[in-house]
Amino acid sequence: GRISGCVNNGDVSAAAQASGKVVCAGGVLGTFDRSDDAGDTAEVHSNTNNGTVTNSSDVKTLCVGGVVGRSSNGTCVIRDCINKGTVVSNSTAVNKVQANRSNFVGGVSGQNSGSISGCTNHGDVSSTSYYWETRIGGVAGTVFGGQRIIGCTNETEATVTTKYERKFNSENAAVVDQEHLGGVIGQCEGSIVDCTNRGTVDQASDPRTVNAGGICGFVRNAAESLSGNANE
């Protein structure tokens, strides 16, 4: 199946309180998935988001993206999409910071298990959420499963930002553990090819571990490749 040629001009927000759940918000799609017997590769292509997308949920996994909140299948393709809206993760649940709570934030897709090609982000991407781990990028917060990110751009006016004060959990003294920030991808388990970052990456919070980069904050599998990319 395909979703193409759609334009969103409205603001989108999610604010769930659901411990142990996954909550996703996107300008066009919250979650993009397909069944194993669905036939051809599923595609989201040539869609545009102009609205602000905000996720302030207190959940196990928070996903927010300008076009797609979460792409959860390796055969799902996102291509030729544009985000012009602001993307925000701003959960304030300080006293519930626990291990294995994840925050994925991206200009095009928050959490991505499929390929992304030819996409452009023009909007600011930011997180002020208190989650154990945050992955945030101008195009995608995280890319799983050896997928390829090809020919994508985070433009000049787009800033990728994390900012909060370090606070201890009153119940078990847990703190925010790690952040990966990238101009294109926050954390990548695949290949990034011919992508460009022209925006600013600004890490202004205080977790235990920080990885920040113009193209990618953290490449999880050293066997995967980055080639032909430019941080301008």
What does each model-identified segment do?
Residues G1-E232:
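Surface-exposed loop/turn motifs in large extracellular/passenger domains
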